[in-house]
């Protein structure tokens, strides 16, 4: 009973409900489906003719359950046999007889279990059984109707005319008929499953996709797969019929295909198919409002001769009203008998009231008075034809009620308002997201045509401000639709509520996690003033390496930037994938290049939104008053104050840097050099957006995101920001406001990745330069431009060999060589090589301010190149050595405004082992800015030394503290020379442990490097009082020294 496999195919649009959702609503019930269920418990009695009331009790219990939830039940019973279903009924009758005989045989053998199964299959619900139930319903004053023929068509008619709000059944044929709301599998507690026909367009599962289907295609698919009116062809199931209709979109084309491919396809099958389709649309039903016999959908005025009997070709007999109703004429004369013989309206009404047998037309009980009314008519919904636009597949409703007379048959042309079965020519059309399937409950005449109403699913698109053209949509191999836009905003965007906030919001199509910000953009491009460059759209692309698998929810990683003149954005929507989109924003004066890499909604603290730290005024971005956090100056505010402490040689070095970089950074090479200090760089006069094309690995400068790369030998372009930039970064790059974000996060080992959650990405300082004015007397050390392998790439190359190499000869400025950690010294020069930084993807967990991020185990090894986590890298498929080798060789930038100052050791570092405030045996050595006073207080009981470093600023903030657990090396400074002295093991408990010994491999040798100053012993510096950035800075300058002193 029903369409095999249809309900599982529609499971994506099946909703679990409870009948209380239909409280105070009218719900029709397929009476025979509940009678069959009730008969299972007493199948033996029913088959053998033993009187029983079990099936009635079952039915009444369900009715009372609905009433208890204030649902108004309307029971519909089957009527007489339908001629078009004659073969099916004969087959069922034969099967029931077979199972009846089997059940009796099992019963004689004593096999009651098998006998009970056979009895259940042999049960036949008769009109007499229905009449016994009707009498109970009358007593309960429950509404009911008996259909003239099939209850399915009667239920559908009540649904589409607004007499009931939903249908409870177990027969999937209701979907093919076109009922609007169908409830399946209801249990005795009222829980059930609901399918709405209007939702079928979004059904997509296991090869089924009904997005561009209509009601006609759905009905014909069900008929091809096999239904009660027509068996299917051999090998023709639901999925095969779906594919044929999906491909050809017209039943005539399907038949032409079947004639070529199927040997068992015949002309007789084709004719029976059209009869079945006609029966689904025009089966005879009873109208409870007008109390006449009518058809489910109005009959066409001209009927195809194939539907008429040879004995009678009168096309208007029995249809005097022109709407399918009989008009009281009982002479059917064989006219369309397969949809149900025409009967008098008086007989049809008696059948509907349950007075006479629908098969024999005999009265059930002559002693019973006639019921006056068993159904409460409801206002009919207006009937209006629906035409189908083959180009757009959109809703088009025609309110003209007289269009029924304009429907043509299949003998000629199509009517402009609709097309009937054999003349419906659907235009071949590809998938369109706007083509959604729906069915309006008040539009019943859609069954006359091959059309249906459709809802529209709109996708977020960007319109060109000039011609309002929709931007191109590209679909990748994973099936996700992306809209690749490249915008240039001519006008500065201001928010009405917060003029100090500018943020880019990623709009998702259907989605769950949207990055919340203080300032949101309106989707109207006219107000945003967005102009799209077609040349930029062609070169827009998304990296495969920018995707990261997510298990539970879809997220969006986005990089948001402050801007007052130019903004670039990109939107994406995907499932169980995370797209990292990195764009660059620039203000013409501030020149801060920033990038945040968020993990998709797991950061809710205020430090994440960097907008709060800026105030926008014209083209200037200035720090806001709320840059102070927890009583201390944030990293951004602190470093902004450092511009008052610029080195004396800053301007001269900056000029030399600009001149050297301007010659090498021409517009055709693809390089965009970022200098600080002056803005005299030729490529950086406007601070605007320029386009850069990758030519080779030696001709590019990589930013925080690798903006230039090649795919399949093709050039790709991206937007780079040419600007003068200062060496401070926004505090939003770290969730810890006290952390000095000028530290390059790419140097964090993967072994301490668990403690590295609060750093969203690298600090965006492309300079691996630690010019500390406080520790080294503000001496800017200059190195020649020939030091090609200095910088982070050379640092990586040298550190790998420093683990095992013995002390070697001093390095030269032009070709640095690998040397051990004990043989390198600092000369009076500073290496200012700028390196390409890269994006570290934040771990999937959230650290707190008390987490081990504030401490670092000295057992970790900085010399191990494995700390560059391939998973953390945004280009996970590339090797880390290759990345830095290609990026760092030719990109040397002299940056003289690096305010990477070592900060005061704060008392808030509670995890500091050996708290020196409570240990009077420790020797405290304070180095001021001039490094002239070195106070050494040696204690015989303890050799531990604590070095506190003061910066030029009186402001202090938290820095990362190193907690050593092994024999630690102290660093002292005397006349700008570094010495290393052995230390005893500190009695401290490590916060974190790792197999890599970081400090011991950098400062593993107890030997001193360089001569002592005259008249003063070396002053040891304890690593315990230094930040991680300071330690790495010292070690970096050691390894980069051109000539060690022994």
Swiss-Prot record:
Residues annotated for Mg(2+) 2 binding in this entry: 171, 173, 228
Residue positions binding Mg(2+) 1: 30, 78, 150, 152
Cofactor: how bound: Binds 2 magnesium ions per subunit. They probably participate in the reaction catalyzed by the enzyme. May bind an additional third magnesium ion after substrate binding.
Region (Disordered): 394-416, 453-474, 519-572, 590-685, 723-743, 773-835, 894-955
GO BP annotations, alphabetical order: DNA double-strand break processing; DNA repair; double-strand break repair via homologous recombination; regulation of protein localization to chromatin
Alphabetized UniProt keyword annotations: DNA damage, DNA excision, DNA repair, DNA-binding, Endonuclease, Excision nuclease, Exonuclease, Hydrolase, Magnesium, Metal-binding, Nuclease, Nucleus
Region N-domain, residue ranges: 1-99
Biased composition (Acidic residues): 545-555, 594-606
Enzyme Commission number(s) from the entry: 3.1.-.-
Subunit (UniProt): Interacts with the mlh1-pms2 heterodimer via mlh1. Interacts with msh3. Interacts with the msh2-msh6 heterodimer via msh2, and this interaction may increase the processivity of the 5'->3' exonuclease activity.
Protein name in UniProt: Exonuclease 1
Organism the protein comes from: Dictyostelium discoideum
